[in-house]
């Protein structure tokens, strides 16, 4: 059974539509002296785009299958995942309840009200604030219990949509990448931001099957490699099992020098990467995920950290709405 056939065993809503573009960044390539390509998952078609829509194709389908009328999820005030979950809920006629934290402890009104947070109000989300998402699975379970007691039928969408079911979205993306690359380019490396780990794990499983010679690198955005590796590996293993795969799993490669000072706080390298892509390619990165991941890619070239000098693919997971919340830092 092919990978595509295995995917068809899982209920899926078609939210993404046609394959997102895979483009060469010609001006950046000339600037760096290295072929750089980009997978434009920032332009998925719901609520200003982003990678979570791929996960929600499977998660929301499962919610509908279970008869849910409410999506319950969690994230930071400027969470791209919560924004996309809320939009999908609106599109499907579901309620959405979001448990939010303020991970950087700021009182700046722009951060607290603009960007992704502004969009949650437009999508009519029921927002619940908490001090910190220290045990998000337990906190979401407790919130779902309260929502159910109010007469709703909740479905819990994990932080980032990151579990084995959601990660199927990035197995699907791997199929797109392989089809778009076939006969055109042979990637030596693929770079992606690694946070809640579902996107990274889905690519790890999919690309192992489809582009086994490509080195997949996750640039961490919230924790050290030692802390992040088990998160990726757990979803990778569960995902492979759900797809009936028995081969040894691909090694998880993580670069963790680019997320300081902490999750959700911009740094100089990330902001420099945002400005570089905007000025050379007219493409918008964000200060939490893709800016830091691109900073890793740029430094990786400078420090010769890649396995060879072949073409590099950058997975653009979205996040540009957060730019407005981080002004004037960006």
Swiss-Prot record:
HAMAP family linked: D_Cys_desulfhydr
Highest taxon of source: Bacteria
EC number: 4.4.1.15
Gene Ontology molecular function: any one: D-cysteine desulfhydrase activity
Function: Catalyzes the alpha,beta-elimination reaction of D-cysteine and of several D-cysteine derivatives. It could be a defense mechanism against D-cysteine.
Entry keyword Metal-binding: no
Full protein name: D-cysteine desulfhydrase
Pfam families (alphabetical): PALP
Catalysed reaction equations from the record: D-cysteine + H2O = hydrogen sulfide + pyruvate + NH4(+) + H(+)
Cofactors, names only: pyridoxal 5'-phosphate
Family: Belongs to the ACC deaminase/D-cysteine desulfhydrase family.
Subunit structure: Homodimer.
Gene Ontology biological process terms, A to Z: D-amino acid metabolic process
Keywords: Lyase, Pyridoxal phosphate
Signal sequence residues: none
Modified residues (N6-(pyridoxal phosphate)lysine): 52
